[in-house]
Regions:
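Acidic (Asp/Glu-rich) sequence patches and key acidic residues
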Residues: 1-133
């Protein structure tokens, strides 16, 4: 079975791009190859994930298909979640941000759908939140 997590950003109540440079900086060491649909990530422990992202569309939200248990993935995601207005969410679950002050930047619809986002202190905490849902 496939599982996806989604990362989007909002600004002034509307969808906004996550700077591509920030996404590339977080995932860069783990990008095995790029293709038009996204990036294959490969981690030191053998874990692999696919990031669906369109580099040329200017939107720069993304989803991670079959997120690996590799700690490097979750640390990279937390780095991205520190961008104001950025939130990670998953089907049937909740929403996570990287800092309490960032909740104010989110679209109101996020809280309506998922409830108040939880602040993750480290990548392992994101994994635990997903596993509990």
């Amino acid at each position: 079975m496939s599982f996806d997590i989604f990362v989007i950003r909002s600004e002034n109540g509307k969808v906004a791009p996550i700077p591509l440079e920030i996404i590339e900086q977080a995932f860069g060491p783990f990008i095995k190859y790029r293709e038009p649909a996204g990036w294959e990530l490969s981690f030191p422990d053998g874990g692999r994930s696919f990031v669906y992202i369109k580099e040329d569309d200017g939107k720069h939200g993304f989803n991670v298909n079959r997120p690996a248990s590799s700690p490097e993935l979750w640390t990279a995601l937390l780095d991205i979640l520190r961008v104001p207005g950025t939130v990670l969410f998953w089907p049937g679950g909740g929403a996570v941000v990287g800092d309490n002050s960032l909740i104010l930047h989110l679209m109101p619809a996020i809280a309506e759908i998922f409830g108040t986002p939880i602040v993750a202190r480290d990548g392992a905490e994101i994994v635990k939140l997903i596993e509990r849902s």
